[in-house]
Amino acid sequence: MAPHLNIVPSMFVLLLLFISASKVQPDAFDVVAKFGAKADGKTDLSKPFLDAWKEACASVTPSTVVIPKGTYLLSKVNLEGPCKAPIEINVQGTIQAPADPSAFKDPNWVRFYSVENFKMFGGGIFDGQGSIAYEKNTCENREFRSKLPVNIRFDFVTNALIQDITSKDSKLFHINVFACKNITLERLKIEAPDESPNTDGIHMGKSEGVNIIASDIKTGDDCISIGDGTKNMVIKEITCGPGHGISIGSLGKFQNEEPVEGIKISNCTITNTSNGARIKTWPGEHGGAVSEIHFEDITMNNVSSPILIDQQYCPWNKCKKNEESKVKLSNISFKNIRGTSALPEAIKFICSGSSPCQNVELADIDIQHNGAEPATSQCLNVKPITIGKLNPIPCSGPVPKTPSATA
């Protein structure tokens, strides 16, 4: 009989475990069923969304805010923590911003602030409806641009997973990550017209432990741009294009910028972009440092500047052209990069005369020019370390003497 006596307690323990597991399932806060949201594309979602967030954030057990399928108009929303327990947002529907840029007085549309243990998922779409903004966003119209909203902002967010979300036609950046730690963005889809200005796919700064994985980015500016203070970051399995490539920077434009270090970009495909793997710093008086940057296993398809270090970065020729960049670049590698260049200059290393690039490595490079001329490589103020087979031959071409005007 003793063996049978042992079975009953075991079954009882399993039952208790099952009951306990069922209790830790997140409580659902449905913006339609519980908070009165209407998926009619006209009624503002802001209050139901914020009310659902506040109630979920105050819960002492894990919770999920649910936005069901349908089309919702959202004027803007600021979702703040800290929350008392882990919190999720399950976005199944399409959330649209007001199309008129004048509806925004600051650069925020959907903002998450000071949230920990957060997840957003569901296959939903954040549609910035940016077409009117694109027409008015010119180099001269700075005041207008300063009020354009980012589609989704993550500010001071820790331990987060953003998964299976689409950002469409943002008026400015699609996603901005600032002062975040341990945040993963995975299986995202980002799309805007190739002529849409300042629509960086994902931009980050002053963040650590950011991972961007298995995402498709088509936009009018950098697919991914990495600002100052970014550390220990992984970017992999990205398809980029159209756009301006994957960029470190721009850096050196402002005082007291923090170092960028420990960035690995690998297993990416970049197609029909103006740049591929790029580091860009401004000429002028402000310093900074960039180190341990590694581009590896990247395919370039018809990219105008596949490999580029540009320390004379000067978009629209608005910089101090006669000054050298004060940003120090060191320990940078480009390995196993292959494909085609739309222009003959497949590799450009334009480093600072006052602070030359240190320990720049080229290994196993094979980039063919799509035109009749052979691909070339240009070098200024750098002596790259070379490993393996290299095409084009390093530093084989002339060096431009004026700052570049590419964005």
Curated annotation (Swiss-Prot):
Reactions listed under catalytic activity: (1,4-alpha-D-galacturonosyl)n+m + H2O = (1,4-alpha-D-galacturonosyl)n + (1,4-alpha-D-galacturonosyl)m
Protein's UniProt name: Polygalacturonase
Molecular function GO labels: polygalacturonase activity
InterPro entries reported in the protein's UniProt record: Glyco_hydro_28, PbH1, Pectin_lyas_fold, Pectin_lyase_fold/virulence
Subcellular location: Secreted; Secreted, Cell wall
Signal peptide bounds: 1-26
Source species: Gossypium barbadense
Highest classification ranks of the organism: Eukaryota, Viridiplantae, Streptophyta, Embryophyta, Tracheophyta
GO biological process terms, semicolon-separated: carbohydrate metabolic process; cell wall organization
Pfam families found in the cross-reference section: Glyco_hydro_28
Keywords (A to Z) from UniProt: Cell wall, Cell wall biogenesis/degradation, Disulfide bond, Glycoprotein, Glycosidase, Hydrolase, Repeat, Secreted, Signal
GO cellular component, one term: extracellular region
Family classification: Belongs to the glycosyl hydrolase 28 family.
Protein's gene: G9
